[in-house]
Amino acid sequence: TATVGVAPRIMGYAPAPATRKILARTGLSLSQMNVIELNEAFAAQALAVMRDLELADDAANVNPNGGAIAIGHPLGASGARLVTTAVSQLHLTQGRYALCTMCIGVGQGIATILERC
């Protein structure tokens, strides 16, 4: 798991540097992620993060079951929802790695990588 802080005025951007930090820490690459669960605080925020990470706007492995806009953003449980959804998708697709990332109010971001055993 990796956490970062950015200026509060760009709080939604924090998943991008958090993702880069966890990838550097693990020696993995974004292309190795079979599933990416990016919490959508709002649509523009998710697109900004995806574009910064050089992911296609319609990347099939990003929120493959829909993101927070489609299935909900349970305040206080968003991280648990991301991880549960990612684990389920890894088992369904027999994938190996999942990235879960989200922004946190006032300029924080978090990212974690899961490996299916």
Where are these regions (language model features)?
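Claisen-condensing/thiolase-fold acyl-transfer catalytic domains that form or cleave C-C bonds
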Residues: 1-117
